[in-house]
Amino acid sequence: PGNALAQRLDHARRFATDHRIRIVSPDDFGLIDTLAFHFDEPFADASALPTFRVCELAREQVTVALSGDGADEAFAGYRRHRFQMQGERIRGLIPASVRQPLFGALGKYYPKADWAPRALRAKSTFLELAGEGGAAYAASVGVTPHALRHRLYDQDMKSRLGAYRAEDRYIKAMAEAPARDPLDRAQYADIRIWLPGDILTKTDRMSMAVSLEAREPLLDHRLVEFAARLPVNQRIRGNSGKYLLKKAMEPYLPQDILYRQKMGFVTPISAWFRGALAGEATAIAGGSSLARTGWFDPKALAKIAADHKSGMADHGRLLWQLLMLDKSLERLFGI
């Protein structure tokens, strides 16, 4: 977006850096085959696309680059970390005998408003508060809720999956964490699963795809171990994550940079799938590799694409997941 570009240019002027810009557009969608080739597995984080472009741009000038991965996981920088703390406070204040039926009923009858601003999408929040903390946090990490995934499968695949839930791996990691505080358990699971499985895999493969060596100074084990020993109020204070890390940088960075709202490295795939790439979304239910597996209900896939295009729901990230799976199946198995 234009305001983000203006901010970056302003930062470059402040610090006298040599700033270069590359804008990712729907035309870059053709890279999806390149991504499938380099990941060699169905890797579905859509930020892989701009990560590839950034690495490509950096490689024009250097052969080694520093990455900032790891700070959010070590110092509790994600919004879900704050939500986990707030949710646990509510669970601690309201007995389960009251909380579960109360929030369960609110979650059941509150309208599902995927089209609405995030602040108004309270249905999932109510359902998470009705449940226990580990399950709620695991759900917040995922892109597609279990119930929606289940609706996509055909009957045979549902039978084969049985009681399997992808979230159970996260719940198990939190339960086994050598910690008592809920935030510590959540961060432990992030470092064990999310960081190596998503963030570092993405950075490593996209950088090596262009022969760029990416190094991770914030993952020095001494820094991560130091962060793990910090009390919760040194990681999250008020509405700010990475509290101590930001305080340490106050002598060097202006307030408007340090304390601005967190901006993820996102790709506007939801808008793309309603515009230039709407045809790609519709094709998922037709003659794609995905359709030929027999794993999914074609009508359910078609409804996902139609609801997204009409604005009834935001399935942009799910559609990207499905397309990456489709491209990976085509590449790996020739389906």
Q: Where on the chain are the PLM-derived regions?
A:
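Acyl-group handling in specialized metabolite and lipid biosynthesis
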Residues: 1, 14, 18-23, 44, ...
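Short, polar/flexible loop-turn hinges at active-site or ligand-entry regions and domain interfaces
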Residues: 41-44, 89-93, 233-237
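Adenosyl-5′-phosphate
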Residues: 47, 60, 64-66, 117-335
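Adenylate-forming
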Residues: 47-53
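Active-site adenylate/phosphate-handling loop in enzymes that bind or generate adenylated species
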Residues: 53-113, 151, 194, 199, ...
